[in-house]
Amino acid sequence: MPIRIRLDELLKEREMTLTELSHRVEITVVNLSILKNGHAKAIRFSTLVRLCAALECQPGDLLTYVPET
């Protein structure tokens, strides 16, 4: 998929676990794992807003476009 989720990198930079993020954004660890591993087909804006608030970042910090070659 040409959209890459940088959740792992942001969690490491903030020394935060997936479980801690799950509690902060009220999304299950399973669903966050699906997103983190690039298996999600879509993300709701409300989810993106909660992730950005919890990680203190902008959407562009979390999502990157990688052209397919």
Label every model-predicted segment:
Residues M16-I34:
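Short alpha-helical DNA-recognition segment
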Residues I34, K41, L63-T69:
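Short, charged recognition helix plus adjacent turn
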Residues L11, S22, C52:
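The alpha-helix within a helix-turn-helix
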Residues M1-M16:
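A short, Lys/Arg-rich alpha-helix, primarily the initiator
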Residues D8, T19, V49:
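Residues within the helices of the helix-turn-helix
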Residues N31-I34, T47, D61:
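Residue-level recognition of specific faces of alpha-helices
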Residues H39-R50:
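Short, basic-rich loop-to-helix N-cap that marks the start of a DNA-contacting helix
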